[in-house]
């Protein structure tokens, strides 16, 4: 790690962040990644208020602060759910994009819309790995299709937006229809990659019973797939 790589345990919304910015700036690039990215963060009014505070209001305050000493480039991460949003999370990120674009005349700002980042923290595929570590059956919707990018691809997208983007640009991965995957197909592929044979069960209880009966050397792994209207996935 380079000697000039410094981290601080500070939230972008903390008053100490403003003091840090004024004391240590100006900066070449400011990349803003703080966000609520889960649809399931809409579970109650307090969660929604926290989401709007983090995704919209704190971003607007950060933009006001940056006007004091504008960086050469400002980047803010968004989500594919900001396109024609159908939930509060997507709408909050759309509002964030509008706020960023409103400052484009004074700040060279870009953003990037992600698809789901495969196996990122809090995602359903990451939950598969946690269940495997606990010797638990995998459970997933079989009728939900999603686009995915790898963590490496998501990082490359951010770098491209930071380095090559023009003010007001919104970057997004160009993915085709055949690249959409179901969570059940991801679970099957993961198990097969690890040397296991997925065994489909008719219920979650049946899957748990089978998991409890399998020995450590058994190559079978119980799975339960179901139809669902939403996955609560992160974008």
For the regions a language model picked out, list residue spans one by one.
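NAD(P)H-binding glycine-rich loop region in Rossmannoid oxidoreductase-like domains
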Residues: 12-53
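NAD(P)-cofactor binding segment of oxidoreductase domains
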Residues: 44-73
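A conserved pocket-lining segment of Rossmann-fold NAD(P)-dependent short-chain dehydrogenase/reductase
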Residues: 127-149, 153-156, 161-183, 225
